[in-house]
Amino acid sequence: MLAHSKRDNSLTKRLLRAFRRGLSRPTYGLEWGDPDTVEPLKFIRDRYVLPYVDARHNAVEIGPGGGRWTRYLVGFRTLYAVDYHQELLDELGRNFRCRSNIRFVRNNGADFPGIAASSIDYLFSFGTFVHLEFHLIESYLTSIRSIIKPGANVVIQYSDKTKIMAQLNKGFSDNSPVKMRDAVRAADYNIIEEDTTSLWHSAVIRFTR
């Protein structure tokens, strides 16, 4: 528990430093890459994000961090930015203060306070589940089911420890396509597609209820 807390605090501090370094920049890439310029991230953006943005729909982003993916999601009717760390939500709010359709939600680890049941058309998370311990991922999968509509699209990036770059990253959790696939199915979702090759340390899964 203590080690997990220290890791969370370290990640928060790194994110806040990255925020402050980039506040004057027009585009947020942070130290993890800019989806406008890094080819694998551009692919994720163009296949798993932009086709689903719809001004009639509601969306959730889990762990928005510096807003590098949030900027592509602001076209939804309502976007719920969900994070455990209030400091990060505060920074994100300053960056997107002109966007009245963003709701900032501080959760308790794997819940969605204030988001109505069966109200979400699209849920996205990138750069967050790669760090989560597997029991938290399973808790999220249970909670997500209650807020999404039937037929909603859920897109999650997660750690793939079968890849050498994930093995070398001590901050990445113990996960793999086999484990993630089994967990998604155990939570009674239908897997639509997976991408296990585009990213050098992780994978992406899209599923629905």
What do these predicted ranges mean?
Residues 113-123:
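A short acidic, Gly/Pro-enriched loop at the edge of an enzyme's catalytic core
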